[in-house]
């Protein structure tokens, strides 16, 4: 395996993959100039960091280390905050690509493994579709994969430098998402599961990781404390909406059951935490987690992975197996907590678990390659593999949805026709930010019905309406004092309507 990692072909494929990853990011960003709604909170926090420093940013927004990095990048480069954020995301995707290929090479023997790993991560639709979004997750995933690489190497060699690499990667992951604390706490215990070593040898390997983890966290607490920032208070503030749900976890679970329509099957005759009621509850929660994971993988890829896992029963090599399983288990547990506490599904929170599953695919593809070569069907394998790459690339890089050009047109019109000193009310983050007419562009109320009721003292109302907002359209047409001055829409009738308030 060491020879494989040092092989120039393995090195070359990672460099090529990183370059392609950056190219894909540029393509996706260019075709999606309007970022996700969460992006505007990160941008506003970065602006606050530039104006008032880290303490003010953390006090106002909580655990926004990602925004601090955006602000620092913005101060060093001749770019605006948005461009700096896109640059960081492009680099984080490149780092994730590099880490995934390296991790697959650590987990499986074979000279073709890096190539298949590069192909998988580059055409993985869930990642590609999010490349234009400003999210801290890309760095978090990359750091977690890097930590797993170092943990596997430490498990194999016992070298302290790998232990230090694991600690630094995990501390950096925590800098982006506090959920990394769970993996930081759990992952070292993978070293206790090795079948070859005695328990004394396992404990001897575990000790350096425990010491380094404690030293790393203590050092971070001390540095921030000396800077006048109390991380415990920041943690409480960042999770102020979720901690009460954890303290009353029974009601939280029942709330999750109600949100997922499990309450239909639970009644006074079928208590939720005993007997059949408990089975129904566990099945529902487990189904939610697995459905979220399948959505993150993509339904087709999830079915193929399940089939190949059943047929080939492939696992990472022995020295990598338990660290990989602990990271998979930790990420699934984090997803479980998210589903129970937040009570809705989103594939983004399942990507870490999906990446752990995708680590198995290069070995499956390599086995298919070997089988095809033995059966003299290699040309067929190559054609099918190329077709799959083409399909996933087009599917994830080309947008087949309804155009959002109308949003850009509305922004251009507003910048040209609305005076800069106007008081503007809007329910669109994008219009608030790009027009420069709303100072608190991250505090937008997105409900058009609520926005229609908060126009007092304003000069213009810029209303974002989806094709389903019939009630808001009717109310706006009847509301006194609103004069429509511009209307922009796509073929589905998603629209931006601009009103002058008389």
Role assignments for model-derived ranges:
Residues 64, 68, 77-95, 130, ...:
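Loop-to-helix entry region of an early transmembrane alpha helix in multi-pass inner-membrane enzymes
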Residues 37, 62, 132-139, 346:
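Short acidic/glycine- and proline-prone juxtamembrane loop motifs at membrane-interface regions
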Residues 87-108, 146:
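Transmembrane-helix motifs of polytopic, lipid-linked glycan transferases
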Residues 31-45, 57-72, 79-83, 232, ...:
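Extracytoplasmic catalytic/substrate-binding loops of multi-pass membrane glycan-assembly enzymes
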Residues 275-320, 331:
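Hydrophobic, aromatic-rich transmembrane alpha-helices
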Residues 21, 116-125, 149, 170-174:
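Short helix- or helix-capping micro-motifs
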Residues 112, 168, 188, 210-214, ...:
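Signature aromatic-anchored transmembrane alpha helix within multi-pass, membrane-resident enzymes
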Residues 50, 104, 151, 384-439, ...:
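Membrane-embedded, lumen/periplasm-facing catalytic core of multi-pass transferases
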